[in-house]
Amino acid sequence: MNASDVQTTQFFARRRFLGGTAATLAVGICEAFPVSSAGADPAGLNVLGPRAGYSPQIGAFVSELMWMREANGVLSATKGLSQADLDYLLDKNANTIGALMLHLAATETYYQMNTFDGIKWDSWSAEIKRKWDAPMELGDAGRQSIKGHDRDYYVNILHEVREKTLAEFRKRDDAWLLTVDKDWPWGGGPTNNHCKWFHVCEHEAHHTGQIALLRKRLPGAKPSSE
């Protein structure tokens, strides 16, 4: 996997109401207001920006992360699929749709441990590796072990992992998001927490495209114009 280069997300101007009088805040770091106010949520998933309960930049990123999941990601791509569909193997080198769903949960879990718990990449405990290495690495191990589950099984795991991510984001500020990891093992040099989590977001887009292709190749699948 290659981490994508990202530029720092620009802050959004926020409006804070004091005693019924609206005061427009300047765009900027806004260190005096490290957590977005309850009125910061825009009306609708398709309006990206700060979110209540998060620092400004983290909230803006959370809106992107949730848009990917809720509007255009793995949930919509797998809607209505049966267990047989999720277990279908296109060829001997392919991954099943179910395995790709669990792969997204595994990836997010490993980034949680690295960025929230400060665990060096690939130094997880044996217990964690037994649980997550097969869906993380996929290949033969994934093909052999990830099967026999309905869609709810995978969706519930994705939801559980995401809820932990959001809870941890609420505990952190924009300075944490921009913290640089000089010892990052791949991607050509240092990175920061923002880039790591941007990868988690775009990683779902990448595999959602694979899932869409696999869905079109399912036995009995109807032709699609997309």
Identify the meaning behind each predicted range.
Residues 61, 69, 73, 99, ...:
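Extracytoplasmic/secreted proteins, especially bacterial periplasmic and envelope-associated proteins
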Residues 134-180, 195-200:
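Acidic/histidine-rich alpha-helical segments that form the ligand environment
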Residues 1-12:
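N-terminal secretory signal peptides
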Residues 29-35:
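C-terminal segment of classical bacterial N-terminal signal peptides
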Residues 79-85:
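Extracellular-facing binding/remodeling surfaces
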Residues 57-64, 86-88, 144-153:
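Second-shell loop/turn segments in exported
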Residues 11-13, 19-22, 36, 41-53, ...:
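Short, contiguous alpha-helical
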Residues 24-28:
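Bacterial N-terminal signal peptides
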